[in-house]
């Protein structure tokens, strides 16, 4: 006997996945009312749909800014889509805003994706890990596996798309983008970003009070 699917459950699934009402109802019916299974089914369909669109050219979009409270931290991010129509959509602009906030919240993030990381950085991380004392007595094969895992973890900390979304830790930024691709029907790409910290790279002046007093006496 098929499980009874309530309108409330359908709405909850829609709120959680941003999929259409009919798609949510169908997913719940196919999973016999299992909410988690229905959610996973919709997630996979959304990612599959997004992957099909990922090769399409995206030259429209917006440059979103985020200034943190106090004005000491700011972010600029360029998010691209295929048409100006989608660029003006509230959902797209909300996505860009969330991504800008994500960058502000993750100071370790330096790159959009893995392919942007220079080989020199990867080689340096590998060198650091291989020289750690806790690996000195490990067999070479085991050592290489441990190093590979540590490097991947370190690189993931630098990659925007690998970060857990600050508003929903169950998904990554990559999954958030793909969900919006499924919703809006266009390829969406985070092209580039820049993070600004007030005074970054500048030497702060440290006045010596005693020296200042002596200078004043000589005047």
From Swiss-Prot:
GO molecular function, one term: translation elongation factor activity
Record keywords, A-Z: Chloroplast, Elongation factor, Plastid, Protein biosynthesis
Entry coiled-coil feature ranges: none
InterPro entries xrefs: EF-Ts_dimer_sf, Transl_elong_EFTs/EF1B, Transl_elong_EFTs/EF1B_dimer, Transl_elong_Ts_CS, UBA-like_sf
Main location: plastid
Domain of life the protein comes from: Eukaryota
PROSITE patterns the UniProt entry points to: EF_TS_2
Keyword Acetylation: no
One Pfam family hit: EF_TS
Subcellular locations according to the entry: Plastid, Chloroplast
One GO cellular component, as annotated: chloroplast
Record's function text: Associates with the EF-Tu.GDP complex and induces the exchange of GDP to GTP. It remains bound to the aminoacyl-tRNA.EF-Tu.GTP complex up to the GTP hydrolysis stage on the ribosome.
PANTHER family tied to this protein: ELONGATION FACTOR TS, ELONGATION FACTOR TS, MITOCHONDRIAL
Family: Belongs to the EF-Ts family.
NCBIfam families attached to this UniProt entry: tsf (TIGR00116)
Name of the protein in its database record: Elongation factor Ts, chloroplastic
Species this chain originates from: Rhodomonas salina (Cryptomonas salina)
């Amino acid at each position: 006997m098929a499980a009874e699917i309530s309108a409330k459950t359908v709405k909850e699934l829609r709120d959680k996945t941003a999929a259409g009402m009919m798609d949510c109802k169908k997913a719940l019916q196919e999973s016999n009312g299992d909410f988690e299974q229905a959610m996973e089914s919709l997630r996979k369909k959304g990612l599959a749909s997004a992957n099909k669109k990922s090769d399409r050219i995206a030259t429209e979009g917006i440059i979103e800014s985020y200034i943190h409270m106090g004005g000491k931290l700011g972010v600029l991010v360029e998010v691209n889509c295929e048409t100006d129509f989608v660029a003006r959509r509230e959902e797209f602009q909300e996505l860009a805003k969330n991504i800008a906030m994500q960058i502000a919240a993750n100071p370790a993030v330096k790159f959009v994706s893995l392919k942007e990381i220079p080989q020199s950085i990867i080689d340096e991380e590998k060198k650091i890990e291989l020289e750690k004392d806790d690996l000195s007595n490990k067999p070479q094969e085991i050592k290489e596996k441990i190093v590979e895992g540590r490097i991947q973890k370190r690189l993931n900390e630098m990659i925007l798309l690998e970060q857990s979304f600050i508003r929903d830790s169950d998904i990554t930024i990559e999954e958030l983008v793909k969900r919006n691709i499924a919703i809006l029907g266009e390829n969406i790409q985070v092209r580039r970003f820049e993070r600004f910290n007030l005074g970054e790279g500048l030497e702060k002046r440290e006045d010596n009070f005693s020296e200042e007093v002596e200078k004043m006496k000589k005047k």
